[in-house]
Amino acid sequence: MLNEIIEKLFYRNNPKSREEVKRRLKLVIAHDRADLNPEIIQAMRKDIIDVVSRYVEIDDTDSEFLLENNQRATSLVANLPIRRIKAKPTQDQED
């Protein structure tokens, strides 16, 4: 039912922009249901990037952090493009 309302409200001739609107709305709903404010999400993003960066070199300019919501749960999805695997652990990891 929610999808039908979204389609009626945001129908456009361009299916790509319609899909983008649906994706953004789902993201807003997931953020709202998870009760996470933008500051918390940014802090989580930084912490995740810091930990993953100990093991691999990532392209953080193209990284994505999304909250996805289905009827049962809200999930944090991190898409982190890997440039290369680090040969040795960084100093932080050894401590």
Swiss-Prot record:
UniProt entry tagged with the keyword Cytoplasm: no
Biological process terms in GO annotation: cell division; regulation of division septum assembly
InterPro entries, sorted: MinE, MinE_sf
UniProt cross-references to Gene3D superfamilies, sorted A to Z: Cell division topological specificity factor MinE
Any one Pfam family match given in the protein's UniProt record, by short name: MinE
Keyword tags: Cell cycle, Cell division
Function: Prevents the cell division inhibition by proteins MinC and MinD at internal division sites while permitting inhibition at polar sites. This ensures cell division at the proper site by restricting the formation of a division septum at the midpoint of the long axis of the cell.
Family the entry assigns: Belongs to the MinE family.
Name of this protein: Cell division topological specificity factor
Lineage: Bacteria, Bacillati, Cyanobacteriota, Cyanophyceae, Oscillatoriophycideae
Name of encoding gene: minE
